[in-house]
A protein has these predicted regions:
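Acidic, Ser/Thr/Pro/Gly-enriched interdomain connector segments
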Residues: 3-8, 15-70
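Sec-exported extracytoplasmic/periplasmic mature domains
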Residues: 62-67, 84-92, 112, 137, ...
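Gly/Pro-biased beta-strand-loop elements
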Residues: 113-204
Length: 243
């Protein structure tokens, strides 16, 4: 019994010595103590710059929030739409051409997009690119880029800056076009033109295909409704389709 009591006393003594040493070190050298017990951070490697090729160009556009269709390294009409949007939002001449090597490098090096002074808070519809930039507040930094399909030319969707005058939160059949069903339309122009979803998202083509309205994907018109976009909010239509 005396043996175990002696061993217990020795263990307690060792514990007290360690605790006292730890407390003393912490009190005398607080900065060193904190650094000693801080976790060692993982080494973060600098991101490797992307090489300018078909796949990485699409990846770069996607990271910038520019839709390009499938990110697969195969450039199609949706990719050309993305190139057009990128050119607009980086201050270049608008076209849907495939980028040359210099432009490919510029795309993968682009860090941010910039809206010019003509953009307004609201939905800005570019007929040349068949795209819309939804600017959500006056900072002009909070925006989203989406596909649209405007009216068939000549004529098509009226150019100008308009306000939403009325909207219908359900499927609605056009008065002017029999069996012309619109999903949750928001009307803005005096000729009954509207932002709306179509019977099928596949009807939102990369080219002008409507009777004058602005077709959107269902998810995008839903976002507008969910955000409270509506009466009095602005719709700006500009540009010219050159297919």
């Amino acid at each position: 019994m005396r043996f175990y009591l002696k061993r217990f006393t020795q263990v307690i003594s060792i514990f007290l010595v360690i605790a006292l040493a730890n407390f003393t070190f912490q009190y005398i050298f607080p900065n060193s103590y904190q650094r000693f017990f801080e976790p060692i951070p993982n080494k973060v490697e600098r991101p490797t710059e992307l090489e300018p090729n078909e796949f990485n160009v699409e990846v770069s556009l996607m990271r910038l929030g520019i839709p390009t269709g499938a990110v697969d390294g195969v450039w199609d009409q949706r990719s050309r739409q993305g190139f057009c949007i990128w050119r607009e939002l980086t201050g270049r001449d608008l076209n849907r051409d495939v980028p040359d090597l210099a432009e490919q490098r510029a795309i993968v090096e682009t860090q941010r997009l910039t809206l010019d002074r003509d953009f307004i808070v609201g939905v800005n519809i570019n007929k040349a690119c068949q795209s819309a930039v939804w600017v959500k507040d006056a900072t002009m930094q909070n925006f989203e880029i989406i596909y649209v399909s405007t009216g068939v030319e000549p004529g098509g969707t009226d150019v100008g800056t308009w306000s939403i005058t009325w909207k219908v939160n359900r499927w609605y059949e056009s008065v002017q076009i029999p069996d012309g069903w619109m999903y949750k339309p928001m009307f803005f122009a005096y000729k009954g033109q509207a932002l709306h979803g179509s019977e099928n998202d596949s009807f939102v083509h990369w080219y002008p295909a409507s009777h004058g309205c602005v077709r959107m994907l269902h998810k995008d018109i839903e976002k507008l409704w969910s955000a409270g976009f509506g009466l009095g909010d602005k719709v700006r239509v500009y540009g010219k389709w050159q297919g």
